[in-house]
């Protein structure tokens, strides 16, 4: 087994990716594009990804879908993914995110069934900003103090987060930057035949229609929490004893009225006492 020249170095870790791993991967980038639009920062990130993957010989494909209903868009993209047996991973990326292409390689390297990158919520927690000002935080660090992430970490009885090769186990994660192995959908289809639906959009061909399952579905869980379609997907998987992981070293920018940029690892270090433990 020869080692390819791919070596990723971050402030947290250094990893190597082999040529055999590169040959065995074929992710499908699934890009829900509301109103057929995407952001310029996302486009530049994805262009760099395409060029970088081409340089190292990593096969990939792309599927976009415009739908006003995000849950249906995600389910339709899953159907397209499952209909092509060459695809090994489904990589959801929301088109209002910008990212580092190396982080996708890092997610593949982790070799988890579901691996995510946590991105900031498009909101400012002004109470956190007020506390930061009182504590003498520098002005250019105030935004960092206000950021929250689309993720709920898992904690265990000893109050320590489960860690594996720098990744941490999480309770809920946003689908906006999520890598999913084919095996996940195979298991979920078998577990939830009642979620199969008849496509009436005309966006799926005959083969793809076989894989129309409402896995990304908003509903009220047993704790009376209203779950968004991404958290609903997480709960289906967890109820099958599946695990969801995130790499907290990944930095993502969520684009809205302003740019919300952050790393989950910084949030965990600075706010550990404020993190709620899911029941």
Region spans (language model):
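Anion (oxyanion) recognition and catalysis
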Residues: 54, 108, 237-238
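C-terminal catalytic/acceptor-binding lobe
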Residues: 8-9, 22-24, 191-279
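N-proximal low-complexity "stem/linker" segments adjacent to membrane-targeting elements
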Residues: 2, 6-67
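Short beta-strand-to-loop acidic/aromatic patch adjacent to the donor-nucleotide binding site
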Residues: 87-98
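A short, glycine-/small-residue-rich helix N-cap motif at loop->alpha-helix starts
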Residues: 68-73
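Conserved catalytic core of nucleotide-sugar-dependent glycosyltransferases
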Residues: 100-204, 211-217
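Active-site nucleotide-sugar/metal-binding loop of Leloir-type enzymes
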Residues: 76-89
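Residue-level detector of anion-binding/catalytic polar loops
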Residues: 59, 96, 113, 243-244, ...
